[in-house]
């Protein structure tokens, strides 16, 4: 450009408009919907010669987070889509960018693509991710679809190759966050290489534009701050230092411009220019004056030159219009600029170090601003969604709140939430955790295939089944049980039953509860090798065959992982359908996969609505949701901090009666995920609330409340606990379908808590040990026809007592009262008592175990777990063996008054249950746990009544 000729052009009297006479384009560093809509932006174009617009997260945060400009669009979007805060922000931002681009398009046409651009920034979270930056740049470019768009990419070492790549693909880019000459040189080189690659491929390069955003005032902010400190301290070079105030940033910019002039004069560039290439102009950014002792237009007046852009904040824009002075300042006193840079180096002001620091701080600042922006959007979103989201409220002691907040701030600063979604194992132990995170994606995946489940539901209904009997254990059964207990029998569909026991009486009870001729059996086993579902399948397959008088395969469905033994069995036996799980989802995280959805669909649950409810929690917990707006992350932080900092590791689950069974599912999730390596969260489910005085200082209460169906007694008790200073997290569900949200909410929270506990929440190393011991015993039975003999260390009436040598020695050889008194006498503050009953789980035995546990709690002032075996082996058993050594266990076994054969096996259900109990106890003993087994001889009901009486006396 012939600057001298331009400078001779007529002046308008408006310094902003007249910048073009010097070859400089004024852009506005500001965007706001109302500003564009009311014509204010167009007025700047018409009256001030505005040539472009830049945006950044801080600008959008101010625009979107406050006022009502965006409310109508937010309401409309949320009425039609389930979005994460990041997705919602992007849709809002793209609307703004497109509207702004249309206002600026006449400038784009008039200047033949030199100006008229509006910039949209890639996520600052990707500043150090080359592939992520390039992918997002392409995605945003396509999403906006305006030719006068520039994608903003940071000039970090990782951002520069992404910039080169997308330039070669025809995308116009604003490279931002440049402070040093070296960084600028790398960016300009990348631009030229990108053009050369595209040109060599025979592609048009004339429609690509780029600017290099060179930040100015932030440099003086750092340098001048250092100067002022040294002068105040009496530095010997005080006068020389003071002479550099307000000069280093401008000198740095002038030297960068000299490099631009050299490159654009080179033969290499001229070849590209001849092919239609546009030069990458320098754009002066951060040009608002922060030091009030300087002119408020300093960084505009001193940086005027040909082929440059100055993106100006609104206040500075107005100030320059009012009193800006024009001259070709960028090429003035260039030698002095070099001298200034030499002088700062001699004086030890370390411009190189300052620019490196500014890049680091700039990336962090952009991330902070993006956090605030997404937080503001998330707050708006939560307001408009209201009760469509489950609501969480934490009443915490001040010290626990501070500890949880510290965890959340760490997650925010380090981006652990984004790392979690990226399946980065460094969030936990750096092991193979990343291989077990498909549960993060399963809701979207199942929604994409929900028509298959809906078709299955229609077929089940059409076949007229009266019952669905699911045969499974642990993660394959507990989620479906929640669905069965919460929704009951749905009109027009079969009743869902869930059997997860080897107790022969319980198996028989379930057999009697269904019409074998008219029942759909769902055999659910991820691995296909789990003992219980395999023998249950064998039993009911034979029973159904007998009832039907023919091969019953068409009454059976399998849910299993691809390639499993169960898949082979299902094919061999002619099962009606096989539904597949996802190998990279552990059982306890599988409820929103086919393991939960297939039985739900068979029972008539609206699986589409169920999954859509779950999706709300997925989006609320997304990678784009800051910790302050992420309730599931907050829950995980609270649980983790409570356990690690305050010894509050007993997570006491209270649920409204209508959703009571959520606690049973949560037990497995928490215990198996966290109870290992001597630490963990010990879930306490279904323990009726007591007065505050019966609790120790080791509890965190999780209150799952169904709005409109809250229990008055629970409400009163929870209020008393809060008043007493106990930590209570209340989670409100507006509708029963929202248990789907609760499922994901707790899965995510558990993953976060696992990180705080510094364990792998996706393995279960101690579950296998009980299986191994059980296998030894059943193998011995198959070989000899009997289990290996065992001898009680004491007998008292109908009770036989068993223990390893260490426990037996500690308990003595007295009567039942003395032994139980000694056993429970070992309980101390911070412990919990586990009552582990290998008996039929029915209304009577559940009432019995509740009465026993509450007596133990109230007398010993410790948490209590009331479990039925072998069900709990696939649930809380992991924590009892691998978690903290704070459990005192009473295992209860009993004579079976009747037994059931297992088709194809020598052992019976009763033998399997006995082997499981003994295997479980052997592992508890091997781990040095305080454990006692009492075996009841004779009638069970009478024996239980007597045991309850003795326990009451013992404590």
Where do the model's predicted regions map?
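N- or domain-start disorder-to-order transition segments that initiate the globular core
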Residues: 2-39
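Active-site beta->alpha loop and helix N-cap motifs at the rims of alpha/beta catalytic domains
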Residues: 59-62, 66-161
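Flexible, acidic glycine-rich loops studded with aromatic residues
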Residues: 277-381
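Catalytic alpha/beta core domains of metabolic enzymes, predominantly
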Residues: 163, 171-315
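Conserved, mostly hydrophobic/aromatic
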Residues: 56, 120, 151, 166, ...
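Glycine-rich phosphate-binding loops that contact phosphosugars or nucleotide phosphates
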Residues: 455-625, 707-709, 716-723, 729-731, ...
């Amino acid at each position: 450009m012939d600057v001298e000729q331009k400078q001779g052009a007529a002046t308008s009297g408006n310094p902003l408009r007249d910048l073009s006479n010097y070859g400089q384009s004024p852009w506005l560093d500001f965007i706001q919907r109302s500003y564009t809509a009311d014509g204010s932006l167009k007025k700047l174009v018409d009256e001030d010669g505005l040539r472009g617009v830049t945006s950044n997260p801080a600008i959008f945060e101010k625009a979107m987070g406050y006022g009502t400009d965006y409310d109508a669009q937010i309401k409309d979007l949320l009425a039609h889509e389930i979005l994460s805060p990041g997705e919602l922000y992007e849709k809002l931002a793209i609307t703004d960018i497109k509207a702004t681009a249309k206002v600026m398009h006449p400038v784009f046409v008039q200047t033949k693509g030199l100006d008229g651009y509006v910039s949209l920034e890639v996520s600052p979270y990707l500043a150090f991710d080359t592939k992520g930056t390039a992918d997002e740049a392409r995605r945003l470019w396509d999403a906006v679809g305006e030719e006068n768009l520039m994608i903003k990419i940071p000039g970090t070492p990782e951002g520069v190759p992404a910039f080169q790549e997308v330039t070669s693909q025809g995308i116009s880019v604003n490279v931002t966050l440049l402070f040093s000459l070296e960084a600028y040189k790398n960016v300009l080189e990348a631009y030229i290489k990108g053009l050369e690659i595209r040109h060599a491929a025979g592609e048009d390069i004339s429609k690509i534009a780029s600017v290099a955003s060179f930040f100015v005032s932030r440099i003086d902010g750092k340098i001048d701050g250092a100067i002022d400190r040294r002068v105040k301290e009496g530095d010997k070079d005080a006068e020389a230092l003071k002479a550099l105030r307000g000069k280093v940033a401008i000198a740095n910019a002038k030297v960068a411009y000299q490099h631009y002039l050299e490159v654009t004069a080179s033969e290499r560039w001229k070849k590209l220019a001849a092919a239609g290439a546009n030069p990458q102009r320098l754009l002066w950014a951060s040009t608002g004056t922060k030091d009030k002792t300087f002119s408020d237009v300093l960084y505009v007046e001193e940086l005027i030159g040909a082929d440059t852009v100055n993106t100006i904040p609104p206040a500075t824009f107005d100030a320059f219009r009012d009193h800006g002075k024009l001259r070709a300042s960028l090429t003035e006193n260039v030698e002095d600029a070099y001298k200034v840079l030499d002088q700062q180096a001699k004086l030890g002001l370390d411009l190189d170090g300052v620019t490196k620091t500014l890049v680091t701080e700039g990336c962090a600042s952009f991330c902070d601003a993006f956090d605030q922006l997404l937080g503001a959007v998330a707050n708006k979103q939560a307001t408009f969604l209201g009760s469509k989201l489950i609501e969480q409220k934490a009443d915490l002691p001040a010290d626990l709140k501070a500890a949880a907040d510290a965890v959340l701030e760490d997650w925010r600063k380090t981006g652990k939430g984004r790392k979690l979604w990226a399946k980065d194992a460094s969030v936990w132990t750096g092991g193979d955790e990343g291989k077990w995170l498909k549960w993060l994606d399963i809701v979207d995946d199942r929604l994409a295939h929900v028509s298959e489940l809906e078709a299955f539901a229609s077929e089940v209904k059409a076949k007229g089944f009266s019952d669905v009997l699911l045969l499974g254990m642990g993660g394959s059964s507990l989620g479906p049980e929640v669905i069965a207990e919460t929704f009951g029998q749905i009109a027009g569909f079969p009743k869902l039953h869930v059997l997860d026991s080897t107790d022969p009486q319980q198996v028989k009870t379930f057999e009697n509860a269904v019409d074998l001729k008219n029942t759909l059996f769902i055999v659910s086993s991820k691995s296909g090798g789990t003992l219980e579902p395999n023998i249950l399948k064998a039993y009911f397959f034979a029973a159904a065959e007998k009832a039907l008088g023919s091969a019953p395969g068409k009454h059976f469905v399998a849910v299993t992982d691809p390639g499993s033994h169960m898949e082979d069995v299902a094919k061999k036996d002619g099962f009606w359908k096989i539904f597949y799980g996802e190998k990279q989802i552990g059982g306890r995280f599988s409820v929103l996969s086919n393991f939960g959805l297939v039985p739900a669909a068979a029972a008539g649950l609206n699986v589409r609505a169920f999954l859509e409810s779950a999706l709300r929690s997925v989006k609320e917990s997304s990678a784009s949701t800051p910790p302050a707006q992420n309730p599931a992350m907050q829950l995980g932080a609270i649980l983790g901090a409570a356990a690690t900092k305050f010894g509050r590791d007993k997570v006491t689950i209270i649920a409204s009666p209508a959703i009571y069974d959520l606690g049973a599912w949560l037990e497995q999730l928490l215990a198996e995920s966290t109870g290992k390596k001597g630490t963990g969260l010990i879930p306490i489910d279904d323990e009726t609330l007591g007065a505050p005085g019966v609790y120790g200082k080791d509890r965190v209460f999780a209150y799952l409340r169904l709005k409109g169906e809250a229990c008055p007694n629970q409400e009163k008790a929870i209020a008393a606990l809060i008043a007493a200073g106990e930590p209570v997290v209340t989670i409100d569900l507006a509708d029963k379908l929202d248990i789907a949200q609760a499922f994901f909410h707790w899965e995510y929270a558990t993953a976060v808590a696992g990180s705080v506990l510094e364990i792998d929440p996706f393995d279960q190393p101690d579950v296998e040990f009980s299986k191994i011991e059980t296998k030894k015993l059943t193998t011995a039975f198959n070989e000899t026809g009997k289990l290996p003999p065992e001898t009680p260390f004491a007998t008292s009436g109908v009770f036989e007592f068993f223990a390893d040598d260490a426990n037996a020695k500690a308990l003595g050889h007295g009567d039942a009262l003395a032994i139980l008194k000694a056993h429970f006498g070992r309980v101390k503050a911070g412990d919990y008592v586990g009552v582990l009953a290998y008996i039929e789980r029915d209304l009577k035995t559940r009432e019995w175990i509740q009465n026993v546990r509450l007596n133990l709690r109230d007398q010993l002032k410790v948490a209590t777990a009331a479990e039925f075996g072998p069900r709990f082996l696939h649930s809380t058993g992991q924590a009892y063996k691998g978690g903290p050594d704070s459990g005192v266990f009473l295992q209860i076994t009993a004579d079976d008054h009747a037994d059931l054969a297992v088709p194809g096996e020598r052992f019976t259900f009763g033998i399997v249950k006995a082997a499981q109990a003994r295997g479980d106890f052997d592992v508890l003993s091997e781990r040095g746990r305080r454990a006692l087994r009492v075996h009841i001889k004779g009638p069970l009901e009478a024996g239980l009544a007597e045991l309850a009486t003795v326990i009451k006396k013992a404590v």
